[in-house]
């Protein structure tokens, strides 16, 4: 008997065909990957297999039980870890585990041995609220919650999105140990190194299975999607070196000197100093909990430093918050768009927030819709857009007012490789106009696209330089190895 068997599964949301005639099977004890571009139907497929959605047509079996007719038989047998972690932020670590155990008719005490190896890494923090955990710790807690009732099949919908490379490696070490215990694992991932850890992979696109095979065969066959050509930079067109921009590429638009942010005795940001030039793409890297987000909040005027100095676009970060906000753009991990407004309404709203006026807003809105090829979508709710399209819109809105600096906080999390490359072309275009890019990312291939990089560990900047300089200094072949080498020395969790 197969662990999973699908026969001609289809699912539509009104006119949108999320899944069309999907058929495949998964062997027991297999790590089976589901990959594909944004909007391919991956999450819909997971929800059907975990009995959260009913298919419109076809049959799906989990451990031999029908997902429609035998839901109650299936639910105790499956664990599900959605992409955004289904944790209750105001409950403690231990309270979350007890809650999920109760949902599945068991107790935390009974399930403890099945999660002991994973849970032991966060058990010292069992009384801490889930919302106060780092990304890596949330990931371990979410996995523990999905396993506390001892399921035989585990579904993971992009579980490592927004998590640093070290935590991703740790998760996959855990998954390999689960497979050794006979647990079947079905995982969706946008990371190519994770795809290669699967036994087999299904490529899903436009709601259809386009191919199923070993990872390397699938990646080669669909290389245009998963291995698009590397971005070739024309560095002469950036940092104001050409195009008649007359920009001073040596002018520092961000300057930080001995910056500290303490919460009681805990120093989230611990004496950091650096500068960023006009038109530079500066990668601000660090493991989860290293202090990146806190530092970014200081630079954008969202928080006050405990000590030290800093300026952004010529304004003091301690005393001139409002001036800074007028000269920067900001794009968060969640894109900061309003899902219940249309594309056009979102653009106009943010234009107004940035102080733009009537005719200018109308002209630039039309210009942006045309550039993004969103003219036919201008009256569509943002909630209806695929993730990659939301990403492009959010970035375009964040630089709509031509700020001197734009802060991008993990802007490509959960987006497929081809869409990420397209997004970076937008970044290069903005940098060519003299906009300074300050970006955090957990994708180390993106780190290679930056002019310079800093790597934070335990609140301090441990390394800073160009990708080539850092690889040479630490004698490593790529930025993934450099990052892992430095981040593994962290003492914070």
Tell me what each language-model feature is:
Residues 98, 102, 107-125, 348, ...:
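Conserved ABC ATPase "signature" region
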Residues 212-213, 464-465:
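ABC ATPase "signature
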Residues 154-157, 406-410:
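Catalytic Walker B motif of ABC-type/P-loop ATPase nucleotide-binding domains
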Residues 58-66, 74, 308-316, 323-324:
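Conserved ABC transporter NBD signature motif
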Residues 129-133, 340, 381-388:
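Conserved ABC ATPase signature
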């Amino acid at each position: 008997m197969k662990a999973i068997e699908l026969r001609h599964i289809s699912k539509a949301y009104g006119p949108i065909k999320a899944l069309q005639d999907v058929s495949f099977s998964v062997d027991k004890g297999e790590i089976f990957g589901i990959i594909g571009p944004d909007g391919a139907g991956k999450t819909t497929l997971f929800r059907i297999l975990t009995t959260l959605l009913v298919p419109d047509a076809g049959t799906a079996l989990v451990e031999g039980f029908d997902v429609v007719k035998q839901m109650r038989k299936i639910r105790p047998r499956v664990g599900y870890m959605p992409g955004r972690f289904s944790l209750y932020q105001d409950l403690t670590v231990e309270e979350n585990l007890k809650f999920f155990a109760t949902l599945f008719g068991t107790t935390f005490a009974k399930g403890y041995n099945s999660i002991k190896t994973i849970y032991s890494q966060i058990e010292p923090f069992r009384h801490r609220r889930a919302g106060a955990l780092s990304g890596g710790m949330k990931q371990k807690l979410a996995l523990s919650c999905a396993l506390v009732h001892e399921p035989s099949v585990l579904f993971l919908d992009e579980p490592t999105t927004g998590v640093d490379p070290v935590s991703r490696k740790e998760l996959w070490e855990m998954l390999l140990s689960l497979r050794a215990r006979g647990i079947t694992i079905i995982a969706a991932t946008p990371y190519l190194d994770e795809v290669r850890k699967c036994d087999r992979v299904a490529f899903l696109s436009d709601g259809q299975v386009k191919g199923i095979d070993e990872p390397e065969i699938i990646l080669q066959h669909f290389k245009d999607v998963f291995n698009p050509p590397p971005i070739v930079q024309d560095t002469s067109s950036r940092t104001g070196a050409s195009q008649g921009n007359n920009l001073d590429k040596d002018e520092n638009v961000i300057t930080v000197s001995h910056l500290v942010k303490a919460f009681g005795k805990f120093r989230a940001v611990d004496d950091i100093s650096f500068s960023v030039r006009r038109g530079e793409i500066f990668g601000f890297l660090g493991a989860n909990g290293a202090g990146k987000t806190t530092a970014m909040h200081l630079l954008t005027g969202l928080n006050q430093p405990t000590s030290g100095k800093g300026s952004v676009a010529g304004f003091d970060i301690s005393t001139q918050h409002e001036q800074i906000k007028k000269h920067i753009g900001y794009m968060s991990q969640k894109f900061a768009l309003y899902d219940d407004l249309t594309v056009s309404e979102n653009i106009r709203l943010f234009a107004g927030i940035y102080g733009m006026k009537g005719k200018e807003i109308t002209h630039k809105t039309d210009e942006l819709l045309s550039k993004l090829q969103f003219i036919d979508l201008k009256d569509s709710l943002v909630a209806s857009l695929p993730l990659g399209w939301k990403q492009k819109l959010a970035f375009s809105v964040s630089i709509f007012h031509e700020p001197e600096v734009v802060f991008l906080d993990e802007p490509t999390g959960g987006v497929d490789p081809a869409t990420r490359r397209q997004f970076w072309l937008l970044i290069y275009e903005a940098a060519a106009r003299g906009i300074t890019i300050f970006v955090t990312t957990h994708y180390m291939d993106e780190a290679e696209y930056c002019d310079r990089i800093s790597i934070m560990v335990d609140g301090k900047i441990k390394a800073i330089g160009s990708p080539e300089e850092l690889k040479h200094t630490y004698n490593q072949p790529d930025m993934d190895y450099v990052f892992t080498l430095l981040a593994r020395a962290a003492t914070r969790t």
